[in-house]
């Protein structure tokens, strides 16, 4: 039918052309095609990428993780996670008949799905999977269709999938290739809108599709698949573009080359494909808007116009359209094209003087197929033979080649030849480059005069088949089918023709660099005729034009116009400068040129045909911009002149059937066809043999225009062209995406030895060593040189105020000194009148330092000036360097013990104090009540096998246990020997043990008898000799139980029995009796600091305790922060009225008097009368601090102050009764991260942790590297029982073995007979600790008191215990006795200020206390080093003036001050009269502290010097005399945290603390001694296969796979954001370094030659500090992952140069002190994950502080955690088979307080929910938490777990939280 249609089309076209209506008919067809293209509307499509939230239009919208947008689409990496409900992605209105249009490129070969649609029941409904070599369409569960299409070849693929009914069709090549598959099943009616649409994978745990995707659209109209190329986005054609620096393909007449900018991928030419139809089944040729006429002068013919988007290629009917019509001419040009692209022209009728030249269309396939093979590129071979050379026969086969005759070479024939396999494929010379592989490499430079041939490349396209449909086999003859389609129907070949062999699919260089223009007719060659020609190839036309042509005469061309191109008058020909010799190999050459760039001056060539060259001097870059929109169809132009014969076009798609033609003449009988494939329907008969070919019918009418051809695959890369001139500079491209970080390169060879370097800087000193023993005092040395200024020390804690010193004597005024450096702060001069506040001046420039002046003598104290106004509060200055730690001050006076105040609210838990010395053993306390039984602890590891101990004494008979659960029914035993009937007599002696009997016959199972009464145990007989092991007898029926005999004496101890199989856990036994209270043990070592427990509920207030004895005076603690403003006190009692005093006049201000001795407290006088209001006096000077007065009466109780430091724990008080259970407090917000404190002492050992719950099985990790040999693991779960083995032969009796390891408890047996008490047996070996039993109901009697055991060794440090469950409310306890007075405890560290307490009730008035003795004068502390001058602070805002302070005591006379500057005269007011004294008012509220005023000591009196310029900071002066204590300053703002100071000396012990609260429940006691091992039983029969064991827990990390080859080095990424500051205080360090550099020559170049002087001049502490800082910085730059040198996160270790393996490392996210480093597991296989393991696998607790966790959250972008709940008959997530959550579904609390729950906003991924199966066996439910909000993980609690009972249990298995 196809052949007939083609012939009909040709015939019609030829007839139309013959009638002269060719141009009109072409114009009608072109207009009709334009109308169709402009009116055809695209159906509504669904853009899947846009529905998934990926859009090119939203500028700046962030892409999801793992998705990288680029110009043409999106790149999906392994981290891409795209999932959405099906209803939101694929609307239900689309229906079931869909068309999927795809444009993609795979980057990784795997088995990934491009997409998958799953229903709510998680069944696969629709999916597309790319396998290596296959493309599989999944249409349901286990329903799929596979196509032979390899998507993993690294190329871009544009295809469509049509789903219509029961047919699935793969459409490629823009609709020219269609592979339909009929489904043997029905598809699902519709997609479940409530399901899920997963992009890139089949399920959340499957492998991810990695590649680029330009378009993924779904159309509801299935016809879209046939012309899907019209619906492709224009960016998809540019998806795989590149700019190739190709040289000029054509030379201009002016000689200037031009530049190509080729883009193969844009043209779709990475793998050119052609379709090879059967013989004679192709139309003559196709062009975009024209027709192709044959070269025959009398019968021009044409074909129907094709789709306007379709172009044709050189090579005849076996070509595929290459370019869409939307591309401009510059874009369509490509030197790789083996065809002329564009509209074809009508062939002109050649005159007699014109040589008729024809084009031979040949191909070079990879193989000669026996079936319709993959198409291959057609090449036009051109060769100019010598005139004397005969035409070489073309390599056509006998079955397809028309009859040819050898023509003389008078008409300059150009025969077509194809290289044969026997000949060398390519004759390379040294100058010819090797053919590159099929990639996108540029062509070598080539011109028409170049001597280097242009190799061409032919490729084949992979054959697309389906497993459901086989292509029909092509008819074969005795010879192989031809590699191309012949153009004539003559059956007999010429005698000179040869059979076509398989030409190699290699690049064959041509003999000349000729080129054919894009739209100009190609140079014809003999041996080929246009389609439809009835003449033999090369016969008629060649003979007519042959004699009139000469070898060197140019071939003139008739002027004409090509369709939609420039006139042919613009074309020029130029002779080829080089003519090949006859011996040259004839090779095909690619010819291509755009017609609009050809000139019109023909030049003769030596070979007789023209070479076209470009006209003009304008270079034409191919990629000047993206293709513009499709223009409107223009009006038909006037008919052009006839052109040269066109080359046959590619086969178009099959058109609609035309009208039936008249019956043709009967044709010759054809060969019998092959047997057809069997039909799909069962029972249908096989297809019969194919009938003979019918007679050719009449030519039908031309069909409508075919569909647009698909975009061809990119062709192979040719040789590089010559280097062209550089093109115009392009616009800057978009910023590329950062490439992946390359692997570290190999370690290079060591370089040559360098020259000797300069003397390096002095090395850094190490950390300060420990203090050595104090040596003998040395001889006083000479006064040394002034040392360099040291780094300021750490600020010490504020010491207590010292005593006021005596006033110094007045010194004589010294001589005037040289003006010195500008000092820090001038001394206070005579105070003038207050002047007006001036404006703030500008900051002065820093002056040069002046010379240092001599120290002046002590000046005469100046006259005290008038007090000035209170100054403004200065701005906050920069924090100073830490000062040196102050010495502890003198002890204060012992005060009387005040009255006991009301208990304040509980403050926060303080830090643990230092470990005190162990105290003496106290008296034994009263026996306490037995505590509540704790939860079962974790099972310990199996200890070493102990030696067999001596026989122990017999234990007391225990209470009768509860009956155990009924065991599994055993196999029926052998029938017992029937006893003789008789009266039951006394039991006789037990006879000797007989030999084992032979195996009895298998007896029938007897009826199970009723259970008899329990009898007495008979006496054990004498053990007989051990017999040989007999074969186990077959089980018989259960015999009736015999009567109980009396209990016999215990037998001797038998050998240890074989380890039995682990039985099921028995019921919980009753509670044992409470043991006697043991003696008080020694004080254990301090445990680690426990985790803060949850806030307890408010307890019941206890009775008020007795007044304790007076404790020792404690050392004053450090000054606490200022407390909050207290409430105003209550008014005191009113005193008696005093007499009214006369108003005194205001006297002159006297000098300050000396400090008076403290007077005795006088008695309170009577209240006087109100005096007249006095005149307010002037503000007096601040007096010196007076001596402390006598202690006054105890005032009323003030408001609660801040919480003081926590003292050491006092002696243990008596056990109080349990308080009421307090209410649960709300979780407070996380506080700000505090300053890293000094590492505290090692805490006390924690309690034994409880046994954790079994965690979830984690996801299978990647295979890690081989780790070190680990400790023996716990026993695994029971495996699946294997098949029962055959009975083994009887082995020899083995020697008695050593006692085996403790076996796991076996199955519960039947109740045994109660025996008599046996003698004391030897003590057995120590057994394993049994599992915790359940609480019993009965309470046993107390056991006898045990002996006092020896003091045990110090145990290993236990893990911190869990917070205990809140206890029940206890009974009010009796008042305890006052405890003994304890030793003073050490002062604890300074605590944080507690919350402001509520106002306490007024306490009773205390008695008059005795006057305390004056304290001793403390030793004067050492003088601290002067700190450097601080940076001048910024000007602060003017504060509010504070209220006037109380007048201070009269101070001592100050020293003479310097003469101050004259102040501006202020307004002097007259003094008012003194008023009457007013009524005494109530005490006012305490005002806010006033602003700090400037105060200075009086300076020396000297002449005023000239004001010098402000100098730089001078050297620190000599140590000055200690000054008097200044006024307390205002509380400054919080400074920056200073560097951690060195550990201070241990302070004296503090006061005895209050009685502590009752401690938590202790760990469970040790397991008792193991009982006597019973006798070894005989080997029992094989048991029934056990039930399937539980799924094992997650295994350890596997071995790391071998290191893969290093990937290509990625492009450098964009510059990263500026790095944050290091955790060190850079301001401090920078100032310290600057000070050191400014004040020393250590870093100056001239100092290198004096290293000795440098070392002598520096202090040791400076270098120690520098050395420490250098090591610290080096450890931060290159972390090792150790505890001493941790990394921030594991990813920092992976970025280091050395290769790291998966394992355990130490990290410190906040890079603070190394004491808070945490141990994590680093998973470098998964990109450097930081996996934080829980403390135990059964609890959601992690050993990390909240500060470190906050930093870890900030350093991470995503986190994953797995939690598995193992359950027994317990539902934790969903009930039954539905999707409804259970009533008691568990909830998970995240780190940030959010809740993960079923149906909530945050839900975990539940990959397996086995807990909904309740069949009496253990199951598990796996929860996966994967989030990109690191604040959510790890999970900190699992809530709503149902309570465990005997039949319902659960265990938690908590996996690590892995941060990335």
UniProtKB/Swiss-Prot annotation:
Q: Where are the compositionally biased (Polar residues) regions?
A: 298-309, 386-409, 509-518
Q: What is known of its domains?
A: The C-terminal propeptide, also known as COLFI domain, have crucial roles in tissue growth and repair by controlling both the intracellular assembly of procollagen molecules and the extracellular assembly of collagen fibrils. It binds a calcium ion which is essential for its function.
- Give the positions annotated as glycosylation sites: 271, 1769
Which residue ranges have biased composition labelled Basic and acidic residues? 1202-1220, 1241-1253, 1326-1338, 1350-1360
Q: Which GO terms describe its cellular component?
A: collagen trimer; collagen-containing extracellular matrix; endoplasmic reticulum lumen; extracellular region; extracellular space; fibrillar collagen trimer
State which residues form the propeptide: 42-624, 1622-1860
Q: Which Pfam families does the protein's record reference?
A: COLFI (PF01410), Collagen (PF01391)
Composition-biased stretches, type Pro residues, lie in 432-445, 654-669, 1043-1053, 1130-1142, 1603-1620
User: Is Disulfide bond one of the keywords?
Assistant: yes
- The Laminin G-like domain covers which part of the protein? 71-236
Q: What is this protein called?
A: Collagen alpha-1(XXVII) chain
**Which residues fall in a compositionally biased region of kind Low complexity?**
446-457, 485-505, 572-588, 599-608, 714-734, 911-924, 932-944, 1449-1458, 1572-1587
Q: Which organism is it from?
A: Homo sapiens (Human)
Annotated region (Triple-helical region) at: 625-1618
- Where would I find the Collagen-like domain in this sequence? 625-679, 688-747, 748-807, 808-867, 871-930, 931-990, 1003-1062, 1066-1125, 1126-1185, 1192-1251, 1258-1317, 1318-1378, 1382-1441, 1442-1501, 1502-1561, 1562-1621
* Annotated S-S bridges: 1690-1722, 1731-1858, 1767-1811
Instruction: Please state the gene responsible for encoding this protein.
Output: COL27A1
Sequence ranges assigned to domain Fibrillar collagen NC1 in this UniProt record: 1660-1860
Keyword Hydrolase listed = no
- List this protein's GO terms for biological process: extracellular matrix organization; growth plate cartilage chondrocyte development; skeletal system development
Any GO MF annotation of the entry: metal ion binding
Q: Which disease is it linked to?
A: Steel syndrome: A syndrome characterized by dislocated hips and radial heads, fusion of carpal bones, short stature, scoliosis, and cervical spine anomalies. Facial features include prominent forehead, long oval-shaped face, hypertelorism and broad nasal bridge.
Q: Which SUPFAM superfamilies match?
A: Concanavalin A-like lectins/glucanases
Q: Where is the signal peptide?
A: 1-41
Region spans: Disordered: 278-608, 625-772, 851-1625
